[in-house]
Design a protein with these regions (language model features):
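Glycoside hydrolase catalytic-domain context in secreted enzymes
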Residues: 1-317
């Protein structure tokens, strides 16, 4: 499924060749090369059948062809027919509803569903459980090594960056270099996406902290301006979300960028050695990408053009 809109009812009509060569290929590689313990079925239908109710997908392709030995679970509240899900080989229904239990019990009593199907599904769930460290007596510390995690994150961030073009801007000497830091994302980093992509982080190293840790000096006037602007914007958005049950899954929308005045730009140019601009986008569960996710807004264009023109005119980066 390539979309979040109407994801619970979307019916993807796909030819067998496109399904095999494009959509299933990544899953096939993952299953065959890594032998995962679990697989999750998606919300949508494929060619008229919910994926969680498709025996062709859950059993014929996944298990018989690819050799998957683990457990299949639904996405939360996925699918419509609990009995069909059992027959398909979707072993666990999440989060589990009374009506699903009742439908399965009724189907067993009427003979519509054979107990051997339930036995197979339960066996696969139990086989997964007995392999877990917890079942084998592992006692978690609830004290993760956050420093080690931070080192991995730092390495991933560096390796994941793409430098499109360098016109003499890099490298920059850090020690004592004064930086005019622009863009709301410079002061409010994005730790994760929306919905299940949200991250319960212990802390986030901001652009300011990163620069200062490296020896740069960040312009305090700009810092104070942005931090107040962002705090006020977030307070308004939190107030607007009060009473919305989805608020806990949705990080606050990014604030509109500040367009600096000509006078403030000149003051920043005089006080700083270089300018850094950070623009950010939020993405994740529940929402599809729109044109504005890829294109710069009017304020972003004005910000980039204004800052670059002012600093370049002064012979600065």
């Amino acid at each position: 499924n390539n979309q979040e809109s109407n994801r619970m009812n979307n019916d993807a009509r796909i030819s067998p060749r496109a399904l095999r060569e494009i959509y299933l290929k990544g899953f096939e590689i993952a299953v065959k090369e890594s032998q995962p313990w679990t697989v999750m079925s998606s919300y949508n239908k494929i060619n008229g059948v919910y994926t969680s109710q498709s025996r062709e997908l859950q059993t014929s392709v996944l298990r018989d062809e690819w050799g998957f030995k683990g457990m299949v679970m639904t996405d939360w509240f996925g699918g419509k027919d609990a009995v069909a899900q059992m027959v398909a080989g979707n072993d666990m229904l999440q989060p589990g509803l009374d009506k699903q239990y009742e439908a399965i019990m009724e189907a067993l009593k009427s003979g519509k569903l054979d107990m051997s199907v339930i036995d197979t599904n339960v066996r696969r769930v139990l086989e997964m459980i007995v392999k877990t460290p917890r079942f084998k007596g592992y006692q978690y510390s609830n004290n993760p090594d956050l420093k080690a995690h931070a080192l991995v994150t730092r390495q991933s961030a560096a390796e994941g960056m793409v430098l499109l073009k360098n016109e003499g801007a890099l490298p920059v000497s850090a020690e004592g270099t004064k930086v005019a830091l622009y863009g709301c994302t410079s002061y409010d980093f994005i730790a994760g996406g929306t919905g299940s992509g949200n991250v319960n982080r212990a802390y986030t190293v901001s652009m300011i902290q990163g620069l200062e840790n490296a020896g740069f000096v960040v312009d305090k006037t700009l810092k104070d301006t942005y931090e107040k602007y962002i705090a006020d914007d977030q307070a308004k958005k939190r107030e607007a979300l009060k009473g919305n049950p989805m608020a806990m899954f949705m990080p606050l929308a990014r604030p509109e960028e500040i367009v600096p005045s000509a006078s403030s730009l000149q003051a920043n140019v005089a006080a700083a050695d270089i300018a850094v601009i950070t623009l950010g986008r939020m993405s994740g569960e529940f929402l599809d990408r729109t044109a504005s996710d890829f294109e710069l807004s009017a304020n972003e264009l004005k910000l980039v053009e204004g800052v670059c023109s002012a600093f370049h005119a002064a012979g600065k980066k």
